[in-house]
Design a protein with these regions (language model features):
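A structured, charge-rich N-terminal accessory region that forms the first stable segment of a protein
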Residues: 21, 26-38, 48
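Short acidic/polar active-site loop segments enriched in Thr and Asp
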Residues: 122
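A short acidic/basic microdomain associated with nuclease active sites
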Residues: 44-56
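A generic secondary-structure signal marking the coil-to-beta-strand transition
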Residues: 28, 45-47, 68-69, 94
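C-terminal interaction segment
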Residues: 2-21, 38, 55-68, 73-119, ...
Length: 241
């Protein structure tokens, strides 16, 4: 991460706006953030994966800020824990961000993409858990990405998955109603989900149990074979005796 420019700044940059958020919005972020952190770490990518932290982008004006539900700062250590980020101090613009669309759809569909593009963000995904296939204005996934022509809308779908170029995997919508969540999928077509930490631990436990059972079966088979050979030897001795 670039060195921060330290200078005296009398402006107060709040850590929170003291406004509540919908529980579903929080639950989606709480599941997705550690998934992205573990996935990027597994690929050897150095990045800071955060959630709902203010990113200030205009020195001297604390109203100029954005707080993505989940975001990735490439090249920034995960070991850092800050109250807010200030882009003029060397913090890079987010490589990736996901915003859960709330009742304030105008803010999410119009304002956030405009700000994200203005500050140099690379990829923004809007996830709208309340979107319906019949909706013309809302979609389950809306993707904005920076390319040769600038920051533009590149995909809008009611499907259950979109490809994230920034992360190198798929984003998958799972569950229904209050159980709607966003997961990562890591195969070519987005079918294989990247496991949560609990799922990974359970898979390791199951694999260890399978290995233990296989070893026990092999031991029992070896003992049975040894017993059979000993019996044959004893039978031969008896016949010769």
């Amino acid at each position: 991460m670039p060195a921060r420019a330290k200078s005296l700044d009398p402006v107060v940059y709040p850590e929170t706006d003291h406004m509540g958020e919908h529980e579903l919005q929080r639950f989606i972020a709480e599941l997705l953030r550690p998934l992205i952190e573990r996935y990027l770490k597994s690929r050897g990518v150095v990045a800071h994966v955060g959630a709902d932290t203010f990113l200030y982008f205009a020195k001297g004006d604390p109203t100029q800020r954005i707080a993505p539900d989940v975001y990735v700062l490439e090249g920034v250590s995960q070991e850092l824990a800050v109250s807010s980020w200030k882009l003029w101090e060397g913090t890079p613009a987010p490589k990736f961000a996901l915003e859960v669309v709330t009742s304030d759809a105008l803010k999410d569909y119009d304002d956030i993409p405009a700000i994200f593009g203005r500050i140099g963000g690379h990829e923004l995904v809007l996830f709208d858990p309340e979107a319906r296939p019949t909706s013309r204005k809302r979609a389950r996934f809306t993707v904005f990405r920076r390319g040769a022509q600038g920051f533009q809308l590149v995909e809008r779908t009611h499907g259950d998955r979109v490809r994230s170029e920034a992360l190198g995997c798929w984003l998958r919508a799972v569950g229904e109603g209050a159980s709607r969540r966003v997961r990562l999928a890591i195969d070519e077509h987005g079918d294989v989900l990247f496991p949560t930490e609990a799922e990974a631990l359970e898979a390791d436990r199951a694999a260890a149990e399978t290995a233990r059972a296989s070893a026990e079966q092999a031991r029992a088979a070896a003992e049975a074979e040894n017993a059979r050979l000993r019996a044959e030897i004893e039978e031969l001795r008896r016949r010769r005796g």
